[in-house]
């Protein structure tokens, strides 16, 4: 697979589905957060699907937890549906503010030590 085959426009990412490894739908990408210094995607804000979507909260996931599934054209998150439900959730205004330190909270939750 060439580099060109792996590139995706940012507008294409918005709305893409995210499943867990078992194929359960977790939600859809609503925002992508780019590290302005490194020039890479760090997080996606996922709008949960189904019954636990109530409340209008988004769950940010570290990009490194995602793997692209060519067959189903979805991202697969390296976590269970239950773990996703437990992940920190924020409204859109909170995600747009540095006041909440949401990235640090997300890193701590997923225990990745990447901040």
Q: Which residue stretches match the model-derived regions?
A:
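Peripheral interaction segments used for macromolecular assembly
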Residues: 1-115
């Amino acid at each position: 697979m060439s580099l060109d085959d792996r590139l995706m426009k940012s507008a294409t990412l918005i709305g893409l589905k995210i499943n867990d490894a078992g194929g359960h739908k977790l939600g859809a990408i609503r925002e992508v957060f780019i590290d302005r210094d490194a020039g890479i995607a760090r997080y996606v804000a996922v709008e949960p699907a189904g019954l636990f979507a109530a409340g209008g909260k988004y769950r940010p996931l570290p990009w490194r937890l995602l793997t692209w599934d060519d067959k189903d054209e979805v991202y697969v998150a390296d976590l269970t549906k239950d773990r996703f439900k437990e992940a920190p959730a924020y409204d859109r205004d909170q995600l747009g503010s540095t006041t909440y330190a949401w990235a640090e909270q997300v890193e701590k939750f997923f225990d990745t030590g990447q901040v």
